[in-house]
């Protein structure tokens, strides 16, 4: 192999040494220059640490072990489940999911055995991707003593668990289940044996403390870290839950669920076995009030107005800020809104909004997808005086343009809910000019809110009805098609068919909600929908009945208490001959069910429809939906006991709850006014009969006039014996 040509001799070696000395001097100069730059002026002793890569004391080939100090992750590792444990807990999860237990006692025994097997492994299960859902189910179905034991297992680890991807859901569920138990324990006890029963199952350390203390101990573990947890993707959900629990808010309210729920697809409340419900406002111990104020102050401590306003549009921090604002304005009193350290005053510190930064901040939230939700919460709970200031300064002149926007329209709805009758009527006149544009864009939520609030406030809705009629057209059937968006289902948009198909379900839903709101208000708005139904052809009516959104409108129009008898007599015969077809359809079966109620005073129509169901009995019994319709119409009773079915069809009450012919059913006719008068008279006679004869000398005559009594037979027997 050929070698590289190298110069030999003393001259070549001298040149090589000279070049190496030059390189060494260059490196030393560079090192000295870097060291000088890193010294702090005015203090020669204080130096900034020199990076490893700029120090050559160990030679050019030196590579340090830790060139860059990585952030230290202090999250503890609780271990992993082995394969046998994972298989066991996966089977337990499937068993609870199927819920095929014979009774509640068997299910509780199974839960106890699973919890016993999970002893000492609770933290592993909570942090496991495959088994954390089992822990959520176990928490939902555990008793109070078992929940206290779980609090004991989680104690000392809440700060790390609430930040874990899977364990955070278990913490949420644990706090949600603890809320009704706190309410139950805060009530005065009447039985001394209640505590003894709870302490039987759990150990002394688990059940000795009340649930309120366990919740407060968990909150104390999170103190000092609120600023970081506020924007942590998993811990923020737990913070919202804790705020609602401390405030005693309803945990089943839809508005609260929207800002709390981590997963919409699962409903673990279905597994609850305790009798205490979390619905409605809950009573909480007084110590929760102090803990709530301390938690709110800790969450916003050190946060200035600029940071809070930036948090308003933060995807994770904004929902926490919404709960903070709602709890502060509703639970801590109206005086809290005047406190300069409150969340409201730190967001909007100005008393006047004209040409201020607060006005700019509010204007920017109207069109932000995240910030608009905070603005909804603000308008919903802010005191009346503060609301009027914002409305007059910012909203009143822009209500029309806000109603047109897809995002700002939801804020406009919250504004309409707070307006008085006079302000609502003036606002309606402004919005009416934008109705054609809103109808064209299918932005109907503001129109629906106008109808609902106008009915509540007693406003004149005739101008709105005329505007809607001109916007949708004068032809009745075409108008209904445009409202329900049924004609666009088969004709996608030529410009962007993908976008049209994506937005169509949402547009159909909003159109259905608008039509239902119009039917609930008697007058020209309801007549617009009813006249369209009467002029519609039978095939079009069947299409509406089979539509998931259109069938809701049809059901609303057939409700007995709202629909007139003339309308029901005209539209119900159109369904004759198509009842079996509707009964076998998912949406149409609900229309058939509502026909039973709609024909309460139209017995001849109800019998005609029942005969049609009998003629299609086999097809109905072979279908799940058909069997439900058959049961709701009491068709077994119709075939075997026609008289009792007629009594039920007329709206008469039956003692039996089902229409099974094997049960002995008794028909109780509604009492007429004459029967009620007779009962009152008989009650008066009995009262007078109980009084002494000295007080009521005419009692005997009134008793004889009222009704015959058994003592008369006894007096006859005494006469015979005499």
From Swiss-Prot:
SUPFAM superfamilies (UniProt xref): ARM repeat
Regions of compositional bias (Basic residues) in chain numbering: 1-10
Keyword Oxidoreductase among record annotations: no
Transmembrane domains' residue ranges: none
Biased composition (Basic and acidic residues): 11-20, 27-42, 684-705
Pumilio repeat boundaries on the chain: 113-152, 153-188, 303-339, 357-392, 393-429, 535-573, 574-611
Any GO molecular function: RNA binding
GO BP, one annotated term: ribosomal small subunit export from nucleus
SMART domains linked: Pumilio
Broad class of the protein's primary localization: nucleus
Ranges where the record places region Disordered: 1-54, 187-207, 684-722
Domain of life: Eukaryota
Keywords: Nucleus, Repeat, Ribosome biogenesis, rRNA processing
GO cellular component: 90S preribosome; nucleolus; preribosome, small subunit precursor
Biased composition annotated in UniProt, kind: Low complexity: 712-722
UniProt keyword Ribosomal protein present: no
Family stated for the protein in its record: Belongs to the NOP9 family.
Protein name: Nucleolar protein 9
Organism: Coccidioides posadasii (strain C735) (Valley fever fungus)
GN (gene name): NOP9
